[in-house]
Amino acid sequence: MVREQYTTITEGTHIERPENQAVYKIGIYGWRKRCLYLFVLLLLIVLLVNFALTIWILRVMWFSPVGMGHLHVTADGLHLEGESEFLFPLYVKEIRSRVDSSLLLQSTQNVTMNARNTEGEVTGRLKVGPQMVEVQSQQFQIHSKDGKPLFTVDEEKVMVGTDKLRVTGPEGALFEHSVETPLVRPDPPQDLRLESPTRSLSMDAPKGIHIQAPAGKIEALTQMDIVLQSSDGTVVLDAETVCLPELALGSQGPAGSSQGLYEVCVCPDGKLYLSVAGMGTTCHEHSHLCL
């Protein structure tokens, strides 16, 4: 309680103080005072709860001066230990694992990595899905550890840079268009087979085609004609024995006259046929085979 007294005093004048003095009460009393104390108490409780929750979050999330939990902030970037889940897109410049461990990217649906230009357009994409791996780019390359290109794909060609391309499928390799290669050979215990089931098979080389079987034989089977044609050279059959077992055979002459010998006759169109050998040529006797 504060009492204020207002008295005017004039020099040389004596005034007696009144018996009834005015008293003014300044402050908060009653239920307002109790509500104020209650509000301050609640505010203090909320402050303590917030402080306790802050301490608990710091302990649970493993906050430290260098980062949060397994996530450490270093001069080179962010260092993350253990497994992490990203619920939204992740934009980074470089991702690499520790020296003693591998890098694993895993998702229940698919893993998609995009490369964008300065305008935000996708210039390259790698998508690993549950059924296929999809690559979208102008060129796809696989290099060896020393930087040698092993496999290159673009819109115009597919290039294999290895010393050997091996196809192990039971159906072999299927090519819808032409193939350029300096050498085609099978595994040592297997046979080499070139087949075109419904169309023709063509082999072209400006400096020649060499077919060699050092330890076996070469067979050419066809239902129609086999044509050996040389425009400026010679067709050479270089062997100790040349057999033509299915040549047309003329009629047999008198018994004992030929002694089992035949002569090879040539028609004007190049057709060959056999005629029983005699004292002289007998080709004209069987010239009807040329008709």
Swiss-Prot record:
Known glycosylation sites: N110
Disulphide-bridged cysteine pairs: C265-C290, C267-C283
Presence of the UniProt keyword Magnesium in the record: no
A biological-process GO annotation: cardiac muscle tissue development
Gene Ontology CC: one annotated term: sarcoglycan complex
InterPro entries: Sarcoglycan, Sarcoglycan_gamma/delta/zeta
Free-text function comment from the UniProt entry: Component of the sarcoglycan complex, a subcomplex of the dystrophin-glycoprotein complex which forms a link between the F-actin cytoskeleton and the extracellular matrix.
Name of the protein: Gamma-sarcoglycan
Annotated gene: SGCG
